[in-house]
Amino acid sequence: MPSVRSVACCCLLWMMLSVQLVTPGSPATAQLSGQRTARGPGSAICNMACRLEHGHLYPFCNCDGKRDVVSSSMAV
């Protein structure tokens, strides 16, 4: 039975490989439904990784000072 950590890592890897982020005005890019503005590279991946405390696995993510969505306190 796979552990929660390995399942979370697989989900993050799947998201990183399957989600194509959109930059405004760029030709031939798919846009996710309901998306109005482009987000920074990997921001959805970083947000999830920081929430799951796996940000250290992604060197481009900066989890310092991210707000905890549930308690609205600063994450440590």
Curated annotation (Swiss-Prot):
Organs and tissues of expression: Expressed by the venom duct.
Domain notes: The cysteine framework is XIV (C-C-C-C).
Modified residue annotations for Aspartic acid 1-amide: 64
Protein role: Highly inhibits both nicotinic acetylcholine receptors (neuronal (alpha-3/beta-4) and muscular (alpha-1/beta-1/epsilon/delta) subtypes) and the voltage-gated potassium channel Kv1.6/KCNA6 subtype.
Propeptide: 28-39, 65-76
Principal localisation: secreted
Name the UniProt record assigns to this protein: Alpha/kappa-conotoxin-like pl14.3
The keyword Thylakoid belongs to this UniProt entry's keyword annotation: no
Organism: Conus planorbis (Planorbis cone)
Family: Belongs to the conotoxin J superfamily.
Keywords: Acetylcholine receptor inhibiting toxin, Amidation, Disulfide bond, Ion channel impairing toxin, Neurotoxin, Postsynaptic neurotoxin, Potassium channel impairing toxin, Secreted, Signal, Toxin, Voltage-gated potassium channel impairing toxin
Signal peptide positions on this chain: 1-27
Domain of life: Eukaryota
GO molecular function terms noted in the UniProt entry: acetylcholine receptor inhibitor activity; potassium channel regulator activity; toxin activity
Cellular localisation: Secreted
